[in-house]
């Protein structure tokens, strides 16, 4: 039963199906993750499984975090995430979560941080059309009108303008797992995923109704 897993984006490639069609895929080094805490309704108010991923040097994490990790194992790990479950009795503290918990053909939701592009203008950030480039025009890449004049006398909140572009949490939903390689801890997922190579990804079974119905639904 798959509840979710943390992984590192490796990059994009292509996958050929049985008909010889080329399918763009993303390679993800997922897990192994260690269960670091089991939360129950009696002690925490809800049931959840907390996992950790990514080896790290001792000096890069503080003492309280080291003490928390020591309850489930000796390895020091950097990233954490938790997943709601109905019954934590099915899980064991210190157990491993691996790509073997997922199946080929399963649909997943993948969350990550999109590529940061810094302070960007109107055309790049929102896809605005540019102004005329000739006939004396000086309005090449300007925004144009941003609203009325004296009334309301201000720019309404939410107006699409230049600003910081990217670097936000993005979730891509309903992606299919094309291949599972347990020996190399690899997931081959159809399509593109958020972030640049090396960035952290959170992979969990898709929540959309009916996507995984053939495999018994989400648990």
UniProtKB/Swiss-Prot annotation:
Signal peptide: none
GO terms assigned for molecular function: rRNA binding; structural constituent of ribosome
InterPro entries: Ribosomal_uL3, Ribosomal_uL3_bac/org-type, Ribosomal_uL3_CS, Transl_B-barrel_sf
Keyword RNA-binding assigned: yes
GO cellular component, one term: cytosolic large ribosomal subunit
Superkingdom assignment: Bacteria
Gene3D superfamilies in UniProt: 3.30.160.810, Translation factors
Keyword Mitochondrion listed: no
Listed SUPFAM superfamilies: Translation proteins
Keywords, alphabetical: Ribonucleoprotein, Ribosomal protein, RNA-binding, rRNA-binding
Residue ranges of the region described as Disordered: 125-164
GO terms classed as biological process: translation
Subunit (UniProt): Part of the 50S ribosomal subunit. Forms a cluster with proteins L14 and L19.
Biological role stated in the UniProt entry: One of the primary rRNA binding proteins, it binds directly near the 3'-end of the 23S rRNA, where it nucleates assembly of the 50S subunit.
Sequence similarity: Belongs to the universal ribosomal protein uL3 family.
Name recorded for this polypeptide: Large ribosomal subunit protein uL3
């Amino acid at each position: 039963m798959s509840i979710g897993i943390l992984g590192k984006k490796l990059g994009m490639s292509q996958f050929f199906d049985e008909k010889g069609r080329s399918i763009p895929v993303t390679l993800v080094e997922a897990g192994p993750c260690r269960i670091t805490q089991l939360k129950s309704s009696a002690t925490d108010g809800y049931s959840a499984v907390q996992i950790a991923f990514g080896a790290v040097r001792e000096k890069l994490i503080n003492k309280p975090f080291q003490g928390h990790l020591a309850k489930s194992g000796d390895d020091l790990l950097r990233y954490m995430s938790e997943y709601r479950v109905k019954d934590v009795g099915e899980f064991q503290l210190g157990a491993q979560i691996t790509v073997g918990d997922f199946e080929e053909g399963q649909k997943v939701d993948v969350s990550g941080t999109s590529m940061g592009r810094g302070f960007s203008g109107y055309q790049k950030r929102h896809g605005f059309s540019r102004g005329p480039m000739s006939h004396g025009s000086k309005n090449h890449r300007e925004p144009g009108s941003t609203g009325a004049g004296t009334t309301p006398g201000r720019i309404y909140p939410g107006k699409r303008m230049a600003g910081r572009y990217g670097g936000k949490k993005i979730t891509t939903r309903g992606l299919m797992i094309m291949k599972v390689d347990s020996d190399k801890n690899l997931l081959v997922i159809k399509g593109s995923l958020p972030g640049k190579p090396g960035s952290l990804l959170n992979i969990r079974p898709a929540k959309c109704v009916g996507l995984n119905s053939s495999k018994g639904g989400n648990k």
